């Protein structure tokens, strides 16, 4: 069994930080999470400026956006279990260093390939930090109600970071250049490093359990194969299906190995807990729908409605405010209504809030947009908080790192696949919907069909009536693609809400006993 030795451990073995110390730890963890959450969405607003500067292809643009999530997802389980064994504080500090170096490299990337590589390194740093934030919360907040409050704050910060990312990106792109959205991380990390070294629970984790490197490798290759294969298959590459099947086979080998090992890397008994499974599934499917749509909506505001980066970010403020409100009130809703009602209600609210966007075209609807963003932000965050509280409360402390890593894997896998799948759907619908404009050559039309940002660039170069006609047609084609992704998301969210309503217990009592 793993035992954790930390500063501030009570004499009776209670691992909570004394007094207000644990709330200071929570503040630091939330600030770390805020940095990563902002980084996940800050690029959305910068896409048009980045496209104009680096001129990536549509495939390269999707890789720039979602390589972060595709790298984070397979590494979370490995780093989560390493944190359980060798110390979460060490992993967080190392993650800060990697994240800082990668941020500087991304800021000054001269080519799309260089930016993709830097974003991948950012994913490595993020994977080192994220599981530790949840598992340290689980470590220092042992009272379930107090932990629910802490998770509510953590969830609100995650929502605020993801929602405020476009606002930060809008301000930076408006006044500097697209690379500033990454460079801003460096001075923040310079402040975080000494603070984390002083505040986070120290000591080391002692364990007689061996750490199985082969299992770690299988989990990384399996998840990466699934994500990469699905992405490539969606883009029409024939090798994608082969990679997907290879990933599935590798994960099957991983599961088989975990069942045979006396000390598995991932305790599969966690998945025998209905609440744990419901939480993980809810996170995966909810984030899948949210992240891909958020990217499309950011482009819709700028390239279809004509907003500047800052104006688009301001329009998305209701999403941020509602997300914070959902994070802060979600714990109370969960206690009052239970897991089933809270999760299914949040999913249903999100699906209903997305539905009006199917009537939008190339004209703005500011009031309707505000109400839709409020419903989406609140519904998504309540769902994610309910899922997170259920996952961590149904898990003994010795497995907190594995549980946190599993949740974060679901989150990042959902984010990466959401961008890949929904982005691919948009591209598949957009390209054939953009008919040839008289007077514009085939080469220019092929470039315009790469993406709406490319079409805007071509239209600007052509100018005149032809350029205006091309931009108008491209905007209509993009709206058609956006509607397709919204339909897929609404169906997915609605189906998940029904599944939760019928299959999940009303109130989970798992996890009140922290013993393994």
Give short role names for the model-derived ranges.
Residues 55, 87, 108-114, 176-177, ...:
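Helix-breaking motifs and short loop linkers at transmembrane-helix boundaries and internal kinks
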Residues 66-80, 130-134, 317-329:
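Central cavity-lining transmembrane alpha-helices of secondary-active solute carriers
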Residues 46-74, 305, 310-314:
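Extracellular/periplasmic helix-loop-helix junction of adjacent transmembrane segments
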């Amino acid at each position: 069994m793993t035992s954790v030795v930390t500063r501030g451990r009570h004499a009776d073995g209670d691992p909570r930080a004394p007094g207000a110390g644990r709330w200071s730890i929570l503040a630091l963890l939330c600030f770390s999470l805020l940095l990563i959450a902002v980084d996940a969405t800050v690029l959305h607003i910068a896409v048009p400026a980045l496209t104009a500067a680096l001129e990536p292809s549509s495939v390269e643009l999707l890789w720039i956006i979602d390589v972060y999530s595709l790298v984070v997802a397979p590494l979370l389980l490995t780093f989560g279990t390493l944190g359980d064994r060798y110390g979460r504080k060490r992993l967080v500090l190392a993650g800060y260093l990697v994240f800082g170096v990668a941020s500087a490299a991304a800021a000054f990337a001269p080519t799309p390939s260089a930016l993709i590589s830097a974003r991948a390194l950012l994913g490595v740093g993020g994977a080192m930090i994220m599981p530790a934030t949840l598992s340290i919360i689980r470590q220092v907040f042992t009272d379930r109600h107090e932990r629910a409050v802490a998770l509510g704050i953590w969830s609100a910060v995650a929502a605020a970071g993801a929602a405020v990312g476009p606002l930060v990106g809008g301000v930076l792109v408006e006044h500097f250049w697209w690379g500033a959205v990454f460079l801003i991380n460096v001075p923040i990390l310079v402040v975080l490093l000494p603070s984390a070294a002083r505040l986070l629970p120290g000591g080391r984790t002692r364990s007689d359990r061996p750490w199985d490197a082969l299992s770690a490798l299988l989990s990384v290759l399996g998840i990466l194969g699934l994500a990469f294969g699905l992405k490539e298959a969606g883009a029409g590459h024939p090798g994608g299906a082969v990679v997907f099947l290879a990933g599935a086979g590798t994960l099957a080998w991983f599961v088989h190995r975990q069942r045979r090992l006396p000390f598995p890397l991932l305790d599969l008994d966690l998945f025998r807990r209905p609440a744990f499974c419901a939480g993980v599934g809810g996170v995966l499917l909810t984030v899948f729908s949210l992240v891909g749509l958020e990217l499309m909506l950011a482009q819709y505001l700028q390239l279809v409605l004509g907003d500047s980066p800052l104006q688009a970010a301001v329009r998305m403020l209701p999403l941020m405010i509602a997300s914070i409100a959902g994070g802060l009130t979600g714990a109370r809703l969960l206690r009052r209504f239970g897991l089933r009602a809270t999760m299914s209600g949040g999913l249903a609210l999100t699906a209903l809030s997305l539905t009006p966007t199917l009537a939008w075209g190339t004209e703005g609807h500011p009031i309707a947009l505000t109400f839709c963003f409020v419903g989406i932000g609140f519904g998504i965050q309540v769902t994610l908080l309910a899922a997170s509280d259920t996952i961590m409360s149904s898990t003994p402390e010795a497995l907190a790192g594995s549980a946190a890593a599993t949740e974060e894997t679901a989150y990042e896998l959902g984010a990466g696949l959401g961008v890949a799948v929904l982005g691919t759907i948009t591209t598949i619908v957009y390209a054939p919907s953009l008919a040839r404009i008289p007077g514009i050559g085939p080469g220019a039309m092929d470039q315009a069909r790469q993406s709406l940002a490319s079409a805007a660039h071509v239209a600007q170069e052509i100018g005149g009536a032809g350029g205006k006609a091309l931009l108008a047609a491209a905007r209509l084609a993009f709206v058609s693609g956006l509607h397709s992704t919204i339909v897929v998301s609404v169906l997915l969210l609605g189906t998940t809400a029904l599944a939760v309503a019928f299959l999940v217990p009303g109130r989970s009592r798992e996890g009140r006993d922290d013993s393994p």
